[in-house]
């Protein structure tokens, strides 16, 4: 089965090159524990592979024979504009990586749909010039799930798709969505992802959820990476656990791996240590 690299070098080398094509993976983390940094690194490295192969080889290296880089990278955001995201990504990765990959990532800003039913003034999130003629069009704008579905249907084939974030989508529950719609939406995306043959990464801050609701989202995904802070003495470490992932977890278990330690350097997030059953 074809693999699509996560763009995290040591992780990809551990799991036979990346995720099985057609997967939806939940990146579930505590604030600052590495989930967002994983997301940024994955987008950057997969885009850099085609945008600047020499720079990609310098920071990532060779791609395993079992893996194939996606031809396109799509970044879907509900609240942040492109310029802000680029600034945030520069806090995680070297400037030359961000500059090299920027034009190869296709950003999809769904903030007009996201904020449409909120009390946030339109001029705060929309670059469109307000006019009497445009007000009716704004009222007829698609809902957030419809807009998300349109982007995925048009662009997800064989692509890496980043969704930033499920936490934002959950916060709209009660307006355009009920809570029960969220796991169903995730299951629908997972089903479609198999047909699309790409890789979908979905960011989630699980601190905002009850264990029961978190479990529903894990169950609706093909795979879940758990990012946590681990405290020992006077130090803290970012750690990554593969909670469940069909076609990947078994490989990690065969290596007796129980947890990854992560670090953030010039090339973004990577695995710094592997803990095994002793």
Label each PLM-derived region with a short phrase.
Residues 79-83, 112-115, 167-168, 206-210, ...:
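Conserved nucleotide-binding/hydrolysis micro-motifs of P-loop NTPases
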Residues 14-112:
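Walker A/P-loop NTP-binding active-site region of P-loop NTPases
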Residues 199-267:
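Phosphate-binding/switch region of NTP-binding enzymes
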Residues 1-10:
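N-terminal pre-Walker A segment at the start of P-loop NTPase domains
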Residues 180-207:
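Substrate-engagement module of ASCE P-loop NTPases
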Residues 26, 160-164, 201:
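Structural motif
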Residues 109-185:
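Phosphate-binding/switch loop-helix module in NTP-utilizing enzymes
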Residues 131, 135-140, 144, 154, ...:
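NTP-binding/hydrolysis catalytic cores, primarily Walker-type P-loop NTPases
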């Amino acid at each position: 089965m074809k693999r699509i690299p996560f763009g995290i070098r040591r992780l990809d080398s551990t799991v036979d090159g990346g995720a099985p094509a057609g997967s939806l993976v939940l990146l579930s983390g505590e604030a600052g524990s590495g989930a967002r940094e994983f997301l940024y690194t994955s987008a950057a490295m997969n885009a850099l592979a085609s945008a600047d192969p020499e720079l990609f080889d310098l920071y990532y290296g060779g791609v395993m024979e079992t893996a194939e880089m996606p031809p396109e990278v799509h970044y879907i955001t509900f609240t942040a504009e492109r310029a802000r995201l680029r600034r945030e990504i520069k806090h995680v990765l070297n400037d030359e990586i961000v500059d090299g990959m920027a034009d190869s990532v296709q950003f999809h800003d769904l903030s007009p749909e996201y904020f449409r039913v909120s009390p946030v003034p339109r001029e705060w999130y929309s670059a469109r010039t307000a006019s009497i003629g445009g007000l009716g069009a704004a009222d007829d704008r698609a809902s957030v799930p419809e807009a998300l579905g349109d982007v995925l249907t048009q662009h997800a084939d064989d692509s890496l798709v980043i969704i930033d974030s499920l936490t934002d989508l959950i916060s709209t529950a009660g307006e355009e969505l009920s809570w029960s719609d969220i796991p169903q939406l995730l299951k629908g995306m997972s089903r479609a992802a198999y047909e699309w043959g790409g890789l979908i990464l979905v960011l989630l801050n699980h601190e905002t959820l009850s264990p029961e609701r978190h479990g529903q989202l894990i169950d609706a995904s093909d795979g879940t990476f758990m990012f946590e802070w681990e405290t020992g003495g006077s130090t803290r470490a970012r750690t990554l656990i593969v909670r469940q992932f069909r076609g990947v977890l078994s490989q990690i278990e065969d290596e007796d791996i129980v947890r990854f330690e992560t670090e953030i350097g010039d090339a973004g997030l990577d695995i710094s240590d592997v803990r095994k059953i002793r």
